[in-house]
Amino acid sequence: MKKTLLAVSAALALTSSFTANAAENDQPQYLSDWWHQSVNVVGSYHTRFSPKLNNDVYLEYEAFAKKDWFDFYGYIDIPKTFDWGNGNDKGIWSDGSPLFMEIEPRFSIDKLTGADLSFGPFKEWYFANNYIYDMGDNKASRQSTWYMGLGTDIDTGLPMGLSLNVYAKYQWQNYGASNENEWDGYRFKVKYFVPITDLWGGKLSYIGFTNFDWGSDLGDDPNRTSNSIASSHILALNYDHWHYSVVARYFHNGGQWQNGAKLNWGDGDFSAKSTGWGGYLVVGYNF
């Protein structure tokens, strides 16, 4: 983890001299005026998507957009890009997954139908999706999951953004688990954005999102659970081109593994550590 922190800290130091110039540019130039994208260096610590704690440093492509009836957020990661991580970490150079992807496209029902479906605090309604794909290095290390359902934006009356989505889940590949190729459970997602203040020539904001998963048949298997929670809390400092983030993420039954379960994957007994906190440091360039 020292290497993780040092690597991201070094990247922060190297880019700090450029942020002032970016902040002075009143009209920054991007490749698109609606497709907002960046390349990030991410250092992760004690993530709990499996029963073993994982640390990594990797490259990420991230994008978000909102245009007419289309609303989008997504990212593509290259695990262990720099060949730095702990003993549990596997990635593109070490017989692990060369690519991990998550996308969240939403399609406005209001705009596609031409009908105003708003009422009360519910501003707009969407056909909402959340698709996750882990390429893995073989079938046993691959995941493909599609959540689909209904989403909405909420008018809170405050200077903040709030959206809610509820999905049913179709599980294709899932690292060889017993719930593959079937409808299996549900997800409720809440996302919010709160601008805080101007700071050091940039914009400081708080972003949060939480996934509540429940109703999975995987809980019928030994050492697995039918539910899980992943809750992320992000403090972000944004400039025209550079951005920096500190992320705290809480996992409950991460990866639907029962916390404290006694496991053996062929290299000795260990206890699952699927509940607790992890974190990320991020530095990125918007283009």
Curated annotation (Swiss-Prot):
Q: Which UniProt keywords apply?
A: Cell outer membrane, Ion transport, Membrane, Porin, Signal, Transmembrane, Transmembrane beta strand, Transport
Biological process terms from the Gene Ontology for this record are: monoatomic ion transport
Hey, what's the signal peptide range on this chain? 1-22
Q: What is its main location?
A: membrane
- Pfam families noted in UniProt: Channel_Tsx
**Localization:** Cell outer membrane
UniProt key word Membrane: yes
Membrane-topology annotation of the record: Multi-pass membrane protein
Q: Which GO terms describe its cellular component?
A: cell outer membrane; pore complex
MF annotations from Gene Ontology: nucleoside transmembrane transporter activity; porin activity
Function text: Functions as a substrate-specific channel for nucleosides and deoxynucleosides. Also functions in albicidin uptake and as receptor for colicin K.
Name the protein family: Belongs to the nucleoside-specific channel-forming outer membrane porin (Tsx) (TC 1.B.10) family.
Q: What is this protein called?
A: Nucleoside-specific channel-forming protein Tsx
User: What organism does this protein naturally occur in?
Assistant: Salmonella typhimurium (strain LT2 / SGSC1412 / ATCC 700720)
